[in-house]
From Swiss-Prot:
Descriptive protein name: NAD-dependent protein deacetylase
Species annotation: Laribacter hongkongensis (strain HLHK9)
Annotated positions binding Zn(2+): 130, 133, 150, 153
Alphabetized SUPFAM superfamilies for the sequence: DHS-like NAD/FAD-binding domain (SSF52467)
Active site: 122
Family annotation (HAMAP family): Sirtuin_ClassU (MF_01968)
Subcellular location: Cytoplasm
């Protein structure tokens, strides 16, 4: 593993603007389960996609919110803390290089860790939005209501995340960030969810150095210059040692 991490460190030293696409595997050490896991992922269960769809939210808001809170309980507790992966990316961003994070996660942990440039591809479970008036000014008391309502217009609030049937509006920002970057890393993503899984192919087309850090192989491994199939926590700890970063 050390030789490959040395190559990862060489990519870091050579780049000026690193783009990092992160997935659920980056947050598992924070105690947040990978809902897309091949063995335990809830979103693979029959009917789950329908329960997390815009259509179901519109048809039965109460049932939708019950299902959503079962799948994503961390959204109402805020108890999860950034792990070594989140902290490493924030530490890299504090150097003289630019680090942009495009995250598929909805847990807000990159921001809590201190990363300044975060594009939330799928939104954030920590926010609520009114689909009628688009108001986002809702306090924490709304989060604990069985069916939260907008204090501006009274309509049922939606979690500010991308549901099945909704477009990934942040994709434009992700593409713009990739165009400005000169290195792409993917950390903790199976690269099954589109459209952000198109980024590795674009990076390959542009001959951009790239690396994948994910416990399991993906169908897109051939798109990367480096593939590290080890626990992210171990990779990040070794990477920090190589760069001489202090532990925290």
């Amino acid at each position: 593993m050390s030789d490959v991490i040395d190559e990862l460190a060489a990519q870091w030293r050579a780049c000026r603007h690193l783009l990092v696409l992160t997935g659920a595997g980056l947050s598992t050490e924070s105690g947040i389960p990978d809902v897309r896991s091949a063995t335990t992922g809830q979103v693979r269960q029959p009917g789950c996609a329908d329960a997390l769809s815009l259509r179901f939210f519109q048809q039965d808001p109460a049932a939708f919110w019950s299902a959503f809170r079962t799948l994503f309980p961390f959204g109402t507790t805020g108890s999860a803390c950034p792990d070594i992966g989140h902290r490493l990316l924030a530490q890299l961003a504090a150097t003289d290089k630019t680090v942009t994070v495009v995250t598929q996660n909805i847990d807000g942990l990159h921001q809590r860790a201190g990363s300044p440039h975060v594009i939330e591809a799928h939104g954030s479970v920590e926010r609520l939005v009114c689909p009628a008036c688009l108001c986002r000014d809702h306090d924490a008391t709304c989060q604990v209501q069985p069916v939260p309502h907008c204090h501006c217009c009274g309509e049922v609030l939606k979690p500010d995340v991308v549901l099945h049937g909704e477009p990934v509006e942040a994709m434009d920002a992700a593409l713009a960030a990739l165009a400005e970057a000169d290195c792409l890393w993917v950390m903790g993503s199976s690269l099954e969810a589109g459209p952000v899984n198109q980024l590795p192919a674009l990076a390959r087309h542009w001959r951009m150095p790239s690396a994948l850090v994910n416990l399991q192989p993906t169908a897109l491994d051939s798109r990367f210059d480096l593939c590290l199939h080890w626990p992210i926590g171990e990779v990040c700890a070794k990477f920090r040692q190589i760069l001489g970063f202090d532990s925290d």
